[in-house]
């Protein structure tokens, strides 16, 4: 079996969404728990690609879904395109999650006998683009304007980035040495990161490192 690469995964995602939109997902009738629906879709995609490719499959509870392509699968409703992911460290908000994301956005419709998952968008976000949009935008502006370490620490403090003085000091040194890439997610502080995808799913392939596809 061929090993799956990123391009293969994108091609399969397009076909997968088309197939899923045509099915009656009876086991999801009346289910409104986004996490359960997401897990169902993620497992279905893992099964779908594993029939054609040699892949390493991860566990959605521990680690990422497709370690062999360094990608985690996210599925979310068009009503509120967001999900959560494990918090590793504050650095993720500035330099990205550390892995790619493959995001499926669906519209769920139920009747007494049917459940339709109408797949609307698929977006692949490279790891370098998974940081927070506003935070990286402002930090990049500050660096362009000649900000120093104290300025950066002040900004991180104002934004209530998780961490203490040592974390802020270390991050500020890194930011001044390595300007963060512009991120395109909205990453909200919580016990887990809350990721919002409203912006990234509608970039229409205008940004390098972000691939967008729509079925409708």
Task: Describe the role of every protein-language-model region.
Residues 71:
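Acidic/His-rich structured neighborhood in mature extracellular/periplasmic domains
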């Amino acid at each position: 079996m061929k090993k799956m690469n990123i391009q293969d995964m994108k091609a399969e995602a397009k076909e997968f969404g088309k197939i899923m939109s045509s099915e009656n997902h009876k086991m999801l009738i009346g289910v409104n728990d986004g996490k359960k629906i997401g897990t169902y879709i993620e497992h279905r995609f893992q099964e779908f690609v594993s029939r054609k490719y040699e892949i390493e499959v991860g566990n959605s509870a521990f680690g990422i879904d497709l370690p062999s392509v360094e990608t985690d699968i996210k599925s979310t409703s068009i009503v509120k395109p967001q999900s959560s992911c494990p918090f590793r460290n504050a650095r993720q908000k500035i330099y990205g999650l550390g892995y790619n994301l493959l995001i499926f956005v669906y519209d769920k419709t139920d009747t007494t006998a049917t459940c339709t998952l109408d797949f609307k968008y698929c977006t692949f976000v490279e790891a370098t683009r998974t940081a927070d949009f506003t935070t990286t935008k402002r930090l990049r502006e500050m660096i362009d304007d000649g900000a120093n370490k104290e300025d950066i620490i002040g900004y991180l403090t104002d934004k209530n980035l998780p961490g203490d003085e040592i974390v802020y000091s270390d991050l500020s040194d890194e930011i001044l040495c390595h300007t963060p890439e512009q991120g395109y997610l909205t990453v909200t502080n919580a016990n887990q990161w809350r990721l919002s995808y409203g912006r990234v799913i509608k970039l229409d392939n205008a940004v390098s490192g972000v691939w967008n596809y729509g079925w409708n």
